[in-house]
């Protein structure tokens, strides 16, 4: 007989639409929902950027010569290219309508994470320190609710060799980001030798199904029942060191 073994809930929270720069305590808003012990709170990075002043006024952007030349090669707006360059540590690859960069955070992604989607006016950059943002929000929510939670700041990115975007964790607090399961046993009692699970990325992708990419208006998702280990994980734990990157070496 088949029986239920575990149930995981993914709960999307609708918040007001923010244009950027509002003086809002996000933790207090989220804490209005009945949070439970063990909840994982996933927050879209766009919302964090808006509230942390990460939306740049287009009128204040003056494209450099490099940005103008790169805009010609890619077909992108020179002002957008300038912001991409400002947020990049290294340009990895350039093509028609894309610039793959390594950001100052160490993320390798398209366009340094710079985006204009779901932005009222201006150009959005990634949060300056997503791990720090996640930590601050987690501590505030735990203080407000008395519950132990994890917080993930998520972004959606494309992947090499596969089509489509998926959610990933760029900021993490309160849970493991990378779950090392070496030494545990499989179903047949064999010891796991190399298994590391990017559990924070998996949770971010789960949340992204509910958040969506268009006009869903769900920037915060609660994942309940996932049974994820608490810990001191960080989003940066998921970044492969450049010297271990077989594609760039």
Curated annotation (Swiss-Prot):
Keywords: GTP-binding, Ligase, Magnesium, Manganese, Metal-binding, Nucleotide-binding, Potassium. It is an enzyme of class 6 (ligase). Its EC number is 6.3.2.31, 6.3.2.34. GO terms for molecular function: coenzyme F420-0:L-glutamate ligase activity; coenzyme F420-1:gamma-L-glutamate ligase activity; GTP binding; metal ion binding. GO terms for biological process: F420-0 metabolic process. GTP binds at residues 15-18, 45-46, 50, 118, 211-218. PANTHER family: COENZYME F420:L-GLUTAMATE LIGASE (PTHR47917:SF1), PTHR47917. Binds 2 divalent metal cations per subunit. The ions could be magnesium and/or manganese. Monovalent cation. The ion could be potassium. Its cofactor is Mg(2+); Mn(2+); K(+). Belongs to the CofE family. Optimum pH is 8.5. Catalyzes the GTP-dependent successive addition of two L-glutamates to the L-lactyl phosphodiester of 7,8-didemethyl-8-hydroxy-5-deazariboflavin (F420-0) to form coenzyme F420-0-glutamyl-glutamate (F420-2), with a gamma-linkage between the two glutamates. Cannot use F420-2 as substrate to add more glutamates. Exhibits maximum activity with GTP, compared with UTP (66%) and dGTP (25%); with ATP, only F420-1 is observed as the product; CTP and TTP support no activity. It catalyses: oxidized coenzyme F420-0 + GTP + L-glutamate = oxidized coenzyme F420-1 + GDP + phosphate + H(+); oxidized coenzyme F420-1 + GTP + L-glutamate = oxidized coenzyme F420-2 + GDP + phosphate + H(+). A divalent metal cation 1 binds at residues 115, 155. A divalent metal cation 2 binds at residues 156, 213. Homodimer. This is Coenzyme F420:L-glutamate ligase. It holds the Pfam family F420_ligase. Optimum temperature is 60 degrees Celsius. Thermostable. Retains 70% of its activity after heating at 80 degrees Celsius for 15 minutes. It comes from the Archaea. Pathway: Cofactor biosynthesis; coenzyme F420 biosynthesis.
């Amino acid at each position: 007989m088949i029986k239920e073994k575990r149930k995981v809930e993914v709960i999307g929270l609708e918040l007001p639409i923010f244009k950027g720069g509002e003086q809002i305590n996000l933790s207090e808003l989220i804490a209005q929902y009945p949070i439970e012990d063990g909840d994982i709170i996933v927050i879209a990075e766009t919302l964090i950027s808006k509230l942390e002043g990460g939306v740049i006024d287009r009128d204040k952007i003056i494209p450099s010569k490099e940005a103008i030349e790169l805009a010609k090669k890619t077909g992108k707006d020179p002002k957008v290219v300038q912001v991409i360059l400002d947020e990049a540590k290294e340009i990895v690859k350039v093509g028609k309508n894309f610039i793959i960069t390594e950001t100052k955070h160490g993320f390798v992604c398209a366009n340094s994470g710079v985006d204009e989607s779901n932005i009222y006016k201006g150009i959005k950059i990634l949060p300056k320190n997503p791990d720090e943002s996640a930590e601050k929000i987690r501590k505030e929510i735990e203080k407000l609710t008395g519950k132990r939670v994890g917080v993930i700041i998520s972004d959606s990115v494309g992947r090499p060799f596969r089509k489509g975007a998926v959610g990933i964790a760029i900021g993490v607090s309160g849970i493991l980001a990378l779950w090392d399961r070496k030494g545990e046993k499989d179903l047949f009692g064999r010891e796991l030798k190399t298994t590391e699970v990017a559990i924070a990325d998996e949770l971010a992708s789960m949340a992204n199904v509910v958040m969506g990419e268009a006009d869903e208006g769900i920037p915060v998702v609660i994942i309940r029942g996932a049974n994820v280990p608490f810990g001191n994980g960080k989003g940066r734990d998921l970044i492969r060191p450049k010297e271990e990157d077989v594609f760039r070496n």
